[in-house]
Amino acid sequence: MAATAPEPAFWDALGWQPSQAQRDQLEELQGLLQSWNERVNLTRLVNGDDFWIGQVFDSLWPLAGELQSANEPQHWIDVGTGGGFPGLAIAIALPQAQVTLLDSVGRKTAAVEAMASSLGLADRVGVRTERIETTGRDRHFRGSFDRAVARAVAAAPVVAEYLVPLLKTDGEALLYRGQWADSDAVPFNRALRLLAARLVEVQHRQLPSDRGTRHLLRVKPNGPCPRSYPRAVGTPSRDPLGS
């Protein structure tokens, strides 16, 4: 199926008016994703509203503040990027950002790296094939990012252990969630205390076309993350903090 363009109301709902070059890049990204998805099982959200709402809108709706200061150079990392979201959408929307896309599955990172190159983003988008627990202990990455994001990766305490060690002390982690209840905050806040971090905001948004409610958790460090985190590969998911 050919790439499509959303109606103007889509951008109004998102609260962001991309340049024509950015619109062209997002449309090109849809075509690239469709093509690569025939070879590598990246995602089912590639056509029509599945792509524009389920991928682009869902990636960018939490970034209202960041989109208003899009020319500010920042270092971002997308953990568990899968088919490249939200990382590739963020790289297009924030033209001064340096974005690292991380996934442990080599077939996915190869596809995402090729898409970034085709989009002309290779100078700002780096791709890394590695388990996040390893990256979080690498001195070249630990404590290096202004923003760390993850969408649909694991339970919130697990994701926090993945993201917080990557942050600068004035950085912020963005945890994309589907549903979120007050009861979820109890184990999550216990985990954050161990990581020397705090929950600063819970945002929520109804997606267009009745595509469900999404939540975003914004987390900030209280100081450097204790060096014991992240724990060994597999331990965060097997034995979540705060449980």
From Swiss-Prot:
Q: What does this protein do?
A: Specifically methylates the N7 position of a guanine in 16S rRNA.
A single GO molecular function term of this UniProt record = rRNA (guanine-N7-)-methyltransferase activity
Q: What is its main location?
A: cytoplasm
> If you read the UniProt record, what top EC class would you report for this enzyme, in one word?
transferase
Q: What compartments host this protein?
A: Cytoplasm
Q: Where does S-adenosyl-L-methionine bind?
A: 80, 85, 132-133, 151
Q: Which HAMAP family match?
A: 16SrRNA_methyltr_G
Coiled-coil stretches, from where to where? none
* Pfam families noted in UniProt: GidB
Gene Ontology CC terms, in alphabetical order: cytosol
Q: By its UniProt entry, which InterPro entries does this protein fall under?
A: rRNA_ssu_MeTfrase_G (IPR003682), SAM-dependent_MTases_sf (IPR029063)
Would you tell me the protein name for this molecule? Ribosomal RNA small subunit methyltransferase G
Superkingdom per UniProt: Bacteria
Which keywords appear in this protein's UniProt record, sorted alphabetically? Cytoplasm, Methyltransferase, rRNA processing, S-adenosyl-L-methionine, Transferase
Give the originating organism: Synechococcus sp. (strain CC9605)
**EC numbers for this chain:** 2.1.1.-
Q: What residue spans carry the region label Disordered?
A: 211-243
Asked if rRNA processing is a keyword of the record, the answer is: yes
What's the family?
Belongs to the methyltransferase superfamily. RNA methyltransferase RsmG family.
| Gene3D superfamilies named among the record's database cross-references | Vaccinia Virus protein VP39
